[in-house]
Amino acid sequence: MKLLHTGTHFRRLVARPATVAVLTVGLLAAAPQFSSSVSAKASAPSCTTPVTSAPTGRATVSTKSTEFGTVLSVGSGALSGCSLYLITSDELHSLTFGLAAFACSDGPNPIGQPCDTVLWPALLTKGAPIAGPGVKRNLLGTLTRTDVLSGESVQQVTYAGLPLYRFFQDESAEETDGANLFDPVTSPSGTWYLVDPGRGNPAPGRLQMASEKVSGSKVLAATMDNDFSLLPGGSFPVYTLSNKNGQACQTYCALLWPPVLTSGQPEAGNGVAQHALGVVVRPDGTRQVTYKGKPLYLFIEDAYIPGVTGTQSINGAGAVTPWGTFNTIPLS
């Protein structure tokens, strides 16, 4: 697959729970093309290979250099070099001490393909995983899953506590097509990121901010191009938080209002002054984009399907939450 090399690295499938009806129509309309793509890729011995059986040996995790920086990859075997990803909504499993399900499982979804075996194949292991070059052994771990292979008990590799996956559109070890991709197939919804080996944090690359017209208003938005999508990518409005320094949104809050992340300085797009953009380091070490000193957030119910009239909207403006009030940023 040919990669789009732009200054933007937020790549997503655009959809949210608020637009599930429209989303389902759009996905089902594209289902034949999507299903045939999965079937064709499943037979190729590449990073697209689905999980079909329990592992027979120990998995190795290594690192590689990409446009997003140094990230985790499969370290040995036929899948050596394939990009590895985490999904942010798996944090809910940790925050609820295992009561909440993992976001990516083999359960039903609108696309009709199992998330953790076909779309985002889980990295499985038999025994403790092996730390390759650049990987911190103390951050490697495993967890037991019974929702990956139709009830069979298997061990999935984790890094800094979060499960690791491949992406079925990464046809070769050079590809990172799943980076920064919002996934409506998972439940709860979340964003897929490459993984920084230093702390196990997301490795988002450099984010672009631009002025976009949403629901008749020009607002500051995060540009989210996606070179893999059933539909074209677009932009999502961003929000500031009304509390003293705008940084009160952590843990549960961040699952509903994901921080806008970047690796390095964000890029100013159309209608945005570069000097107004900055970064602040969050408690987990990730770099959050700021505008005029205020940290920026997304809202999980703001997704839309480009080209489908009436689906693009601003749903979080003025939302009063336990952490403060969220507001968009009007631009002229």
Predicted regions mapped to residue ranges:
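Compact beta-sheet-dominated domain cores in extracellular/mature segments
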Residues: 40-332
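Secretory targeting and sorting signals
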Residues: 2-39
